[in-house]
A protein has these predicted regions:
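Aromatic, loop-rich ligand-recognition surfaces of beta-strand-rich domains
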Residues: 1-66, 74-212
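Short, conserved helix/loop micro-motifs enriched in His/Cys and acidic residues
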Residues: 71
Length: 212
């Protein structure tokens, strides 16, 4: 077993040290969106969503498509959401990967004006995907699966809805390692003091992470 020797400390290049001691009388606010640092691989997945396009259409080949939004400032492997501004109802929706991207999108969720999650009638699109990362993975409700292309050819994944619908909210998350703060999960914040861990707070994750 590991035996603690004391409080953690910072060791500086000149050999000096600074002990880190918890001060529970002076708390700061902190919004956490991940449980673990963002690796270079995860950062690359985020980058591959930048400028990806969201289209609606009434023709299944998207020859009449309308761009209703783009993925912007995707810098963290977590859910993002926006409310597209357009008029009318459409039967088809798709995500089109940007140039020089393999897609690497974990999940897309569509909501109507009443906040109901829309269930695709059919999922289809660009055929050349990595085995195990086909189009249906983008709408399977599992953020640990993903839609990944074999080549960077602006591939896309589309859905047919049950009926023409106005999409009022779009949520998406890049391919990830599951270390983001998940909505509905319980999180505990501990601090070290002398020779043991102490529970400081307990929160339920929401769409924006957790605020301590």
């Amino acid at each position: 077993d590991m035996i603690p020797e004391g409080n953690p400390f910072i060791l500086y290049p000149d050999g000096s040290q600074k002990e880190i001691v918890a001060n529970t009388s002076q708390l700061q606010k902190l919004r956490a969106v991940r449980k673990y640092t963002l690796t270079l691989e995860q950062k690359d997945y985020c980058t591959q969503m930048e400028n990806g396009e969201f289209h609606v259409a009434n023709k299944e080949d998207f020859s009449d498509s309308l761009i209703v939004g783009m993925a912007k400032d995707v810098k963290e492997s977590r859910f993002y959401s926006f409310k597209p501004k357009y008029k009318g109802s459409y039967r088809f929706f798709r995500y089109m990967a940007p140039a020089n991207s393999y897609g690497n999108v974990a999940e897309i969720e569509l909501y109507d004006k009443d906040g109901n999650k829309l269930k695709p009638k059919r999922v289809y699109g660009y055929r050349w995907t990595v085995r195990g990362h086909e189009q249906p993975k983008l709408y399977d409700g599992d953020p640990l699966t993903s839609f990944t292309l074999q080549a960077t050819k602006r591939g896309w994944c589309g859905v047919e809805l049950e009926e023409p619908t106005h999409i009022s909210e779009i949520r998406y998350i890049p391919r990830n390692d599951g270390n983001y703060i998940a909505e509905g999960d319980k999180y505990q914040l501990y601090f070290w003091d002398k020779d043991d861990w102490h529970l400081l707070a307990e929160k339920i994750g929401n769409r924006d992470g957790v605020l301590w």
